[in-house]
A protein has these predicted regions:
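A structural signal for short hydrophobic beta-strand segments in well-ordered beta-sheet cores
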Residues: 6-8, 77-80, 146
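Hydrophobic/aromatic beta-strand patches that form the interior of the parallel beta-sheet core
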Residues: 1, 31, 181-183
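A conserved short coil-to-beta-strand element within the FAD-binding core of flavoproteins
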Residues: 1-16
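Central helical "cap/lid" subdomain
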Residues: 18-72, 99-106, 119-124
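C-terminal catalytic lobe of FAD-dependent flavoproteins
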Residues: 122-192
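Short strand-connecting beta-turns/loops that link adjacent beta-strands
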Residues: 10-13, 83-84, 151
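Conserved FAD-binding catalytic core of PHBH/FMO-like flavoproteins
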Residues: 62-89
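Conserved FAD/dinucleotide-binding core of flavoprotein oxidoreductases
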Residues: 81-129
Length: 192
């Protein structure tokens, strides 16, 4: 169950967390799959996650592009229309968390598409366009974070000498919170 922004606490029977309404949830296993909201929890804020804003543009299918049967990928993407509408995009705004739809982002999406398909006419006015804004959660190396959640204090103590000896053989298991797992950093490859 989604609890919103919350921290989790060790309990003799497992883990406890409270949602924003004060409801308490207890479990022996905790799976954290809350994308960029992991940066608000004290136990996971140190993980190498970043927020990237993206906006798609919804455009009426043209006579030419209405027959598109496969996705066209370029610096953006243009899939076949659904119910007469193309959903193209998307913008890429690191550290931008504003969820307001922007006409400038529609212009960016259309410009990328017009550059990739110069012989096709696209709308130049953005007033009739709509779109969708969402926040992606990525990692600094763009590989997802999957598995047990490391215990930061124990992790830093265990691997402190790696700062000075980067090639040192690691002969210890990573100290983790038992029963707490994470799935994050999927970026644009997330499941919705």
């Amino acid at each position: 169950e989604f609890c919103g922004d919350c921290d989790f606490l060790a309990d003799p029977t497992g883990w406890k967390t409270h949602d924003s309404q004060g409801n308490c949830y207890e479990s022996d296993i905790l799976i954290l799959a809350t994308a960029n909201r992991l940066t608000t929890s004290s136990e996971t804020a140190w993980l190498p996650l970043q927020t990237i804003r993206g906006q798609t543009t919804h455009m009426a299918a043209t006579e030419l592009l209405g027959n598109l049967r496969t996705a066209f990928c370029h610096e953006g993407y243009l899939p076949p229309p659904r119910l007469g509408i193309h959903c193209l995009g998307a913008t890429y705004g690191p550290q931008d968390t504003n969820l307001d739809e922007r006409s400038t982002d529609h212009v960016t999406n259309l410009t990328k598409l017009a550059t990739a398909l110069p012989s096709v006419k696209f709308p130049t006015a953005t007033a009739d366009l709509s779109g969708h804004v969402a926040l992606r959660c990525t990692t600094t190396d763009y590989l997802p974070v999957v598995g047990p959640v490391p215990n930061k204090a124990a992790f830093n103590a265990c691997y402190a000498d790696l700062q000075a000896q980067k090639t040192r053989f690691i002969d210890q298991e990573c100290p983790v919170f038992p029963g707490v797992f994470v799935l994050a950093g999927l970026g644009s490859r997330g499941l919705t």
